[in-house]
Amino acid sequence: MTVVDVHSHVFPRFTRAEGRTLADAGEPWLRVGPGGAGMMMSGDDEYRPVEAGLWDPARRLADMDAGGVGVQAVSSTPLMFGYLAEAGRAADWCDLVNERILDYCAHAPDRLLPLCQVPLQDPDLACAVATRAAAAGHRGVHIGNHVGDRDLDDPGITGFLAHCARIGLPVLAHPWDMLGAERMRGHMLPWLSGMPAETQLSILGLMLSGAFERIPASLRLCFCHGGGSFAFLLGRAENAWHNRDIVRADSPRPPSAYIDRFHVDSAVFDPRALRLLIDVMGTERVMLGTDYPFPLGEKDPGGTIRACPGLDDGERALLLGGNAMAFFAPAPAAAPAPTPALDSETVGTGPVYAEGGAP
């Protein structure tokens, strides 16, 4: 059985000059000292000390071997998203990031699955960048869970998600730029409290806005960190949908009806929490995620899954790798759309598109 980790990060060795591509939008770059100590930088400011696996593929592969991980999906670090930049500059930045991620993963192409990033602040550009990245070899796309005040149920962003469904590109959604940060000034509370709330907000937004009704069911979508607080609070949302018309106004079905529209990773760090998550999502909707190589990640890859009560060997195998292999499996090539016949009913009525092909 191949163990597959769907949630890991990379930060290529961008120079200070390269980081200036995102002037006034974070300017991310990586400083590596003479002794090998790494520091993620935002302009001139130190952001976070980091370990070598974040930029050194040899170190990552050694850590994977030590942890029994066969394959990792490799995605950018959220500091690199660039959503605050002008869209054209952000697209150039994403092309550079995506090229560097491909270079990084080329050290072990059978073990490292590259995930691209896109300028999500401009959904049309995001579609173009995602299409280029997929053609270049990226196996999925990594996005933040919002762009400013635009959440995943924003019409433009749902259009991007629909595009990913049409081209068969899996989507990994990661919380970032956490709400309420002004009230969470210490103890990493934005990561401990804000991130789970962000993900819960994104999932419920897609459900209650009716967005899942508009996005093709073929979309492969995964939320990090076990879907945040969603599983624990599903009952609250379900009760509200049944009892308040303002909750169900835009959603024809209750929240529980959309559970089969997305996956979550296993990064909840407690077998009891994972058991609840599996009970809510089902064994085929949960995949191993470690958050490698950050300090808040799972140090024993798959340890929580192995310790989770009530799983048989087959179910553990699904969580440890089987589900991820299916999630990231290359989409079958789409058959060419038939050319519609033109007759007196269609001539002069404007363009004729195959299903799903309208711009």
Describe every region a protein language model picked out.
Residues 120, 175-179, 292-294:
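Short glycine-enriched loops at secondary-structure junctions
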Residues 15-28, 88-91, 157, 237-244:
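Aromatic- and acidic-residue-enriched segments that line the glycan-binding/catalytic groove
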Residues 130-287, 342-358:
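Catalytic pocket-lining loop regions of alpha/beta-barrel enzymes
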Residues 81-83, 126, 179-186, 296-298:
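Short acidic/His/Gly/Ser-rich catalytic and metal-binding motifs that mark active-site loops
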Residues 87-94, 102-163:
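Long, hydrophobic, well-ordered secondary-structure blocks that form the structural core
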Residues 1-9, 13-71, 99-107, 128-132, ...:
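Mid-to-C-terminal alpha-helical segments outside catalytic/metal-binding sites
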Residues 41-52, 61-85, 111-119, 139-143:
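Divalent metal-dependent hydrolysis catalytic cores, especially in the metallo-beta-lactamase
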Residues 77-93, 124, 186-189:
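Surface-exposed, active-site-proximal loop segments in enzymatic domains
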